């Protein structure tokens, strides 16, 4: 509980929580993933939730800006490891501003405020393969569920060969290292991402991967949408 909410007090409290001996990697809020087939690179904007330049972010050769994927099958996925959330209570009097006049003066703008921030790790994965979609989907789902021994996923020979031959790109947010986000490629990096992603620590607590907003007018939930090009 933060007695006097504010940016400084929030980060101070967060720092104390991270340094606590009880702050360990066995208490993640959740691990979840979603995936879908794609044929054009711009479809991957759905994973990012915005109109971004997929070619720049995933370092796809400019010659493919016609949009269609290079290989027979494409699968993109978003893997989320939610470690913990920082949540602000609703204002006791219902007004996020200091007084009613400030709320009234901004009502025509429909202002919103950030109500919660979730820290964790996220991977946006692109897999292109000459195999059919059902085979790619099966291999991908298996990679997320099989055991790892000695840092290697215990995949069957067929699934491992498929993933080794596939073109895999992973944009990782919140992993180990000083970079907030980094792009890695290939089966070995895909395997490393899966095997090493189960825990977090005070050294690797994660980064903000989600936030929720509320309208200042009545504290109802704010939502948005976008249209891909």
Q: Predicted regions: what is each one?
A:
Residues 1-229:
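Membrane-permeabilization and membrane-interfacing ectodomains
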């Amino acid at each position: 509980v933060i007695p006097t909410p504010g940016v400084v007090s929030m980060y101070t409290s967060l720092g104390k929580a991270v340094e606590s001996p009880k702050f360990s990697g066995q208490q993640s809020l959740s691990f979840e993933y979603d995936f879908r087939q794609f044929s054009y690179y711009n479809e991957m904007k759905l994973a990012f939730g915005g109109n971004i330049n997929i070619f720049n972010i995933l370092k796809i050769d400019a010659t493919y800006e016609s949009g269609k994927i290079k290989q027979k099958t494409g699968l993109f996925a978003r893997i989320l490891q939610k470690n913990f959330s920082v949540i602000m209570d609703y204002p006791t009097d219902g007004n996020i501003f200091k007084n009613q006049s400030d709320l009234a003066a901004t009502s025509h703008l429909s202002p919103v405020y950030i109500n919660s921030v979730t820290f964790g790790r996220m991977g946006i994965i692109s897999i292109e393969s000459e195999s059919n979609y059902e085979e790619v989907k099966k291999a991908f789902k298996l990679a997320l569920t099989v055991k790892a021994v000695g840092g290697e996923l215990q995949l069957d020979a067929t699934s491992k060969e498929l993933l080794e031959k596939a073109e895999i790109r992973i944009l990782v947010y919140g992993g180990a290292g000083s970079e907030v986000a980094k792009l890695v490629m290939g089966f070995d990096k895909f395997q490393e991402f899966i095997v090493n992603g189960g825990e977090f620590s005070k050294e690797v607590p994660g980064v903000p991967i989600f936030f929720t907003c509320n309208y200042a007018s009545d504290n109802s939930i704010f939502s948005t949408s976008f249209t891909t090009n």
